[in-house]
């Protein structure tokens, strides 16, 4: 989902937004995958009625969005070879982090976990940034058979660990 608007409150990868959807009382917290001046990129998984409604929004739909929520990742701590580890919906905010770390000349490795090969997303985008990508799938249909923690065993020389996603 791409949103046009004021992105000045977003200061670090890993922050999130809260979307107010018409017909729903509760806002939907969605992590920011990437942002630039005037545009937000959000990637979400349909898990309920709210995110289902988001898939049906027409281009140009006006939304009430609270931006710049959460602390985000501290880019100054990554060292020369940061390791990014995430699973499922924890992967999108790591993309924005990888983009900024590679722009700083860091050697980024991303270990990305999925339930099965058919659910893999953003892996090629990480590679396009110059990041090394290790895939782990719970069912063994792609990459390393297991969880992201199993994929971490393939990387031993990292200088800092960034994580986002569900507990293994």
Predicted ranges, named:
Residues 1-61:
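Ferredoxin-reductase
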């Amino acid at each position: 989902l791409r949103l046009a608007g004021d992105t000045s409150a977003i200061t670090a990868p890993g922050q999130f937004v809260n979307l107010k959807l018409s017909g729903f009382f509760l806002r939907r917290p969605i992590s920011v995958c990437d942002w630039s001046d005037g545009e937000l990129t959000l990637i979400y998984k349909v898990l309920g009625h709210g995110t289902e409604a988001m898939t049906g929004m027409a281009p140009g739909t006006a939304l009430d969005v609270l931006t710049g929520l959460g602390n985000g990742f501290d880019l100054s701590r990554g060292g020369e070879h940061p390791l990014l580890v995430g699973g499922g919906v924890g992967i999108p905010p790591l993309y924005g982090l990888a983009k900024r770390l590679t722009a700083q000349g860091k050697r980024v490795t991303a270990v990305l976990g999925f339930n099965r090969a058919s659910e893999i997303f953003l892996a090629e985008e990480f590679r396009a940034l110059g990041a090394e990508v290790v895939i782990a799938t719970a069912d063994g249909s792609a990459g390393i058979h297991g969880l992201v923690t199993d994929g971490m065993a393939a990387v031993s020389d990292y200088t800092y660990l960034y994580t986002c996603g569900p507990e293994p």
